[in-house]
């Protein structure tokens, strides 16, 4: 399918139009950013690894009944996706306390959260992606009350399936970020990506609090061995069936 000029370039992907107005091409980049792009760098082969991981996980979730924008992986670092209007929300699901939750609440790292915590953030780098209360969500009108309920339900369903998937890969899904989009029909689809860039993943074979980290925290915290961690996630994910 013909690739056209870029429609949008974000921190991790470039989005292109194609000959089909309903299909876009997502190209995954090796660029790495943290703290709302205040820290920048590059991770060798990250685009290829994240594309492979996301493609596999989108197929797995589709088999579990989670509708998403993935169509097909068409190159090592490229996938075709359905065109959606991205809802400007970042939806974070937390199974254990980590990251900003620990910093803002004083909860100890690794504290199990039962039920999982679901948080909505405004997708706006200039504002620092602020956490939204239900009233702020309603005030900003970025999604209807019905859409927010549906997105929350979908996020929890994704969490159930991905937690099981990663557990079978010997990995703990600590927390993760999701984005959603609207189809012209109003249907809500899971969008963006699922990868070590957007998930906090701990290796169950490691007890050391630094060695167990298999995600972008290795870049955030200057822990090194970033490529090796992403490669291990890719190896374990691709070895798991998508059905």
From Swiss-Prot:
Q: Which GO terms describe its molecular function?
A: ATP binding; phosphoribosylaminoimidazolesuccinocarboxamide synthase activity
User: Could you tell me what reaction this enzyme catalyses?
Assistant: 5-amino-1-(5-phospho-D-ribosyl)imidazole-4-carboxylate + L-aspartate + ATP = (2S)-2-[5-amino-1-(5-phospho-beta-D-ribosyl)imidazole-4-carboxamido]succinate + ADP + phosphate + 2 H(+)
The Swiss-Prot or TrEMBL record describes its family as follows: Belongs to the SAICAR synthetase family.
The record's annotation in NCBIfam families points to: purC
**What is one process in the GO biological process aspect for this record?**
'de novo' IMP biosynthetic process
Q: What is its EC number?
A: 6.3.2.6
Signal peptide range: none
Sorted keywords for this record are: ATP-binding, Ligase, Nucleotide-binding, Purine biosynthesis
Q: What is this protein called?
A: Phosphoribosylaminoimidazole-succinocarboxamide synthase
PROSITE patterns per UniProt: SAICAR_SYNTHETASE_1, SAICAR_SYNTHETASE_2
């Amino acid at each position: 399918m013909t690739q056209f000029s870029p429609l949008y370039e974000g921190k991790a992907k470039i989005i292109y139009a194609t000959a089909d107005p309903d299909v876009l091409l997502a190209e995954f980049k090796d660029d790495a950013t943290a703290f709302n792009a205040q820290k920048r760098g590059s991770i060798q082969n990250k685009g290829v690894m994240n594309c492979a991981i996301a493609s596999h996980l989108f197929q797995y979730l589709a088999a579990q009944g989670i509708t998403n924008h993935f169509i097909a992986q068409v190159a090592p670092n490229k996938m075709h996706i359905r065109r959606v209007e991205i809802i400007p929300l970042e939806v974070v699901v937390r199974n254990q306390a980590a990251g900003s939750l620990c910093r803002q609440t004083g909860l100890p790292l690794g504290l199990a959260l039962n039920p999982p915590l679901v948080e909505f953030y405004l997708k706006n780098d200039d504002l620092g992606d602020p956490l939204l209360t239900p009233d702020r969500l309603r005030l900003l009108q970025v999604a209807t009350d019905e859409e927010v309920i549906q997105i929350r339900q979908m996020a929890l369903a994704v969490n159930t399936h991905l937690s099981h998937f990663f557990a079978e890969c010997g990995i703990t899904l600590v927390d993760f970020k999701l984005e959603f989009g609207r189809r012209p029909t109003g249907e809500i689809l899971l969008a963006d990506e699922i990868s070590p860039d957007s998930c906090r993943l701990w290796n169950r074979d490691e007890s050391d609090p630094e060695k167990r980290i298999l995600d972008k925290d290795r870049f955030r915290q200057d822990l090194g061995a970033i490529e090796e961690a992403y490669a291990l996630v890719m190896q374990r994910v691709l070895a798991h069936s998508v059905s």
